[in-house]
UniProtKB/Swiss-Prot annotation:
Ubiquitous. GO terms for molecular function: antiporter activity; UDP-xylose transmembrane transporter activity. GO terms for biological process: UDP-xylose transmembrane transport. Belongs to the TPT transporter family. TPT (TC 2.A.7.9) subfamily. It is found in: Golgi apparatus membrane. The modification Phosphoserine is found at S334. Keywords: Antiport, Golgi apparatus, Membrane, Phosphoprotein, Sugar transport, Transmembrane, Transmembrane helix, Transport. The gene is UXT3. The chain crosses the membrane at residues 7-27, 31-51, 75-95, 100-120, 132-152, 154-174, 194-214, 224-244, 250-270, 280-300. This is UDP-xylose transporter 3. Nucleotide-sugar transporter that transports UDP-xylose and UMP in a strict counter-exchange mode. It comes from Arabidopsis thaliana.
Length: 357
């Protein structure tokens, strides 16, 4: 099996793990929040991250992955930003209608595209933009109902969108810049995320629910679903970093909308949640957008791979030409008295090459 095939197989596995684990945790949390009345979402998320860190620490002790420390300030900033984005999303849901909150989630994709275009010079083809538009239109039809606006809720939603986009872009860029795996990044950033939410969680949950998480009556059933939710969250957090590292923040958001459609369908089929033709139409349009997006992404990936493969032989041919080699600094021609000799000279190392255009 070639490296390309292994990478594709790993990407498919990461996407599948993300879908299965995310849908599972939504079902578990729905039972915990809606049925059992445990509405402390931010505090629950801090417990998720704490269990994830402990699980990764055990995996490190068992030598299932290698610890690779890197810039501590980058890790701390990234972890705290991730925690803040989760808290802001929960506040956005608390201070807005469900319909406006869904619009907030839809805004993450165009915001991510805008930020990557402005700051990373990443280009999104018209075909990709078209497929994303179809996807967002479909999810909007399926999920957005009422749009009640208020000033505080709008500001919180804006901050939630920006912090979420930046955090997901950082998840991708940090892995590539410092050459760390998704597991290594998650292991180092988890404590900062957990502490941020552990400190702010009870306050935010109290603000949103008018209840105290420490005064809640923890029955055996509630404890069971909390433990189950925390165990599933290990897979959710791991697959999130894995998907963003292997693909892109935009692809991860597309996957997130697929999960939304699956949860809606699951709620209708098994739980008999209210469902109408608008939901069905929206899901169908969204699925079409996802299929088109996946198709165009695979086509562009193949084109880039073929361009790279055609450039390599040309580079090798240019290295064989002494005149081109001389221009590149890999060799010089000198008169050695009786004839022409070629002397190899190492190219001059420029430490600032990464900062030059």
């Amino acid at each position: 099996m070639s490296e390309g095939q292994k990478f594709q197989l790993g990407t498919i596995g990461a996407l599948s793990l993300s879908v299965v684990s995310s849908v599972s945790i939504v079902i578990c949390n729905k039972a915990l929040i809606s049925t059992l009345g445990f509405t402390f979402a931010t505090t629950l998320t801090s417990w998720h991250l704490l269990v994830t860190f402990c699980s990764l620490h055990v995996a490190l002790w068992m030598k299932m992955f290698e610890h690779k420390p890197f810039d501590p300030r980058a890790v701390m900033g990234f972890g705290i930003l991730n925690g803040i984005s989760i808290g802001l999303l929960n506040l956005s849901l608390g201070f807005n209608s469900v319909g406006f909150y869904q619009m907030t989630k839809l805004a993450i994709i165009p915001c991510t595209v805008l930020l990557e275009t402005l700051f990373f010079r990443k280009k999104f083809s018209r075909k990709i933009q078209f497929s994303l538009t179809i996807l967002l239109l479909g999810v909007g039809i399926a999920t957005v109902t009422d749009l009640q606006l208020n000033m505080l809720g709008s500001v919180l939603s804006l901050l939630a969108v920006v912090t979420t986009c930046v955090a997901q872009i950082m998840t991708n860029t940090i892995q590539k810049k410092f050459k760390v795996s998704s597991t290594q990044l998650l292991y180092q950033s988890c404590p900062y995320q957990a502490i941020t939410l552990f400190v702010t969680g009870p306050f935010l949950d109290g603000l949103l629910t008018n209840q105290n998480v420490f005064a809640f009556k923890y029955t055996s059933q509630v404890v069971f679903f909390i433990v189950l939710s925390c165990l599933i969250s290990v897979s959710v957090n791991f697959s999130t970093f894995l998907v963003i590292g292997k693909t892109s923040p935009v692809t991860y958001q597309v996957l997130g909308h697929l999960k939304t459609c699956l949860v809606l369908a699951f709620g209708y089929v098994l739980l008999r949640d209210p469902f109408d033709w608008r939901n069905i139409l929206g899901i169908l349009v969204a699925v079409i957008g996802m299929v088109v997006y996946s198709y165009y992404c695979s086509i562009e990936t193949q084109q880039k791979a073929s361009e790279t493969s055609t450039q390599l032989p040309q580079m090798k041919e240019s290295e064989k030409d002494p005149l081109i080699a001389a221009e590149n600094g890999s060799g010089v021609l000198s008169d050695g008295g009786g004839g022409v000799q070629q002397k190899t000279v190492a190219p001059v190392w420029n430490s600032n090459k990464d900062f030059q255009a």
